[in-house]
Amino acid sequence: MMKLRELLNGLDILETNAELDSDIREVRYDSRLVKSGDLFIAVTGAETDGHKYIPMAREKGAACVLCERAPEDGAPFVRVADSRRALAVVGGNRFDHPAREMTMIGITGTSGKTTSTYLIKSILEQKAGAKVGLIGTIQNMIGDRVLHTERTTPESFELQKLLREMADAGCTHVVMEVSSHALMLDRVYGIPFAVGIYTNLSRDHLDFHKTMEAYCDAKALLMRQCDVGIYNADDRWAARLMADATCPRRFSYSVNGQADLMAKNVALEPGCVDFDAEADTEWCHVHVGIPALFTVYNTLDAMACCWNLGVPLAECADALAKNHGVKGRMEIIPTPGTGYTVLNDYAHKPDALEKVLQSAKAFAKGRVVALFGCGGDRDKTKRPVMGEIGARLADFVIVTSDNPRTEKPEAIIDDILVGLKGYDTPYTVIPDRVAAIHYAMDHAQPGDVIVLAGKGHEDYQEIDHKHYPMDERVIVAEHLKETQK
């Protein structure tokens, strides 16, 4: 039980008829979960308005409603200007502000967030004696314990609950992916980030943000909520993003020019990347077992973060040399005895697909075969762009399905094929993704690199609101076993 007054601490209350010293059993923002004595927060969302469910919450026994529009039935209410932001404030109060007990690290950007979180976690655990909580796309982790995740950044109340669990488990640091949606929808409102990291910006989520400028401005919000703002100086959106940053300290990293942390003498090899890192008077050689140029950027932002938290560059490099990569991020799926390589990557955006194919071309001794589709019910404008990238960078393209969701796979594929026009690159269309993978393997030659793009860590395919099992690691292994009998 908490007093209503305690839960509302820090809110600008516009109007109320509620007894502020009344007891509240629990906080709910889903009316279906409300029980007698609860505080129901009517959140205004993009798809639905929580105010519509106030009558249901009242029927279930809600003691008070936190809202933007006062209910007409005279029920106890507290009115605020922004109920979504209020949800974050109440969540912090409900769980006693766990973020204040740990060193918070937030990473935003179109690509690279997931890999960077794992690299930072690895360095801090090996070299700073830290117990690190991780929040991200693949999974959430409390130390070594894995928790299920449904979205990149949880809703604010659930985030506060998770952070409390991490703090109580002894976590000293938390590294989390912070999506543009999370920043715009106040899911991380009030979180005191010690370090904020910006990786890059490329075309994505324009169905939500509408323009690249708005997308950039959403990402920029993190730089007004952190003590140290670390950014990729090579990214063309960095200047705009940092223009209104209020972080007391700024720290840049670069592969191509001058910055606070620089990578030099980059060498990309099959299965790894090597380079020299320099910051101030420190220098070290870095070896990472993730074969891609963008790995250098992910490694730099991880090193920049940990260096700003007191870990020397050489210690960062030593920890990174022991890192074996991240599931579904430039992951090499074993194909012994074939002579070809299968790469699995989550590249489901134009920029990510381009970077993966460029990296594959850098070490492929034969052809680069690109197998990909595009997600249904998502930004349709990127589909022909993905097709163009595949045709321009790959030697052979297999257009297939990703997560069709409620769209017809053939319609999505038709959108992708528009981008292949004007190129002589040979291609084929195989809507069934499993059959497409089999085809790629059956026609591969020694030295080829098959890039399975789009699914990455996912072990399912989403069709008509249902998830069907589909793990590309399993598909490759089983087909290899079948064909080598």
Located regions from the model:
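ATP-dependent carboxylate-amine ligase
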Residues: 1-14, 36-39, 125, 249, ...
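Acidic, Mg2+-coordinating active-site environments of NTP-dependent enzymes
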Residues: 6, 10, 67-75, 193-342, ...
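Phosphate-binding loop of NTP-binding sites
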Residues: 8-11, 87-233, 237-248, 279, ...
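Short, well-ordered alpha-helix to beta-strand connector turns
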Residues: 24, 37, 62, 74-75, ...
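Short glycine-rich anion-binding loops that position phosphate/pyrophosphate groups of nucleotides
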Residues: 45-47, 180-181, 202-204, 235-236, ...
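Short internal beta-strands
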Residues: 63-69, 229-233, 371-372, 395-403
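Active-site regions of enzymes building and remodeling cell-envelope glycoconjugates
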Residues: 74-83, 147-150, 247-251
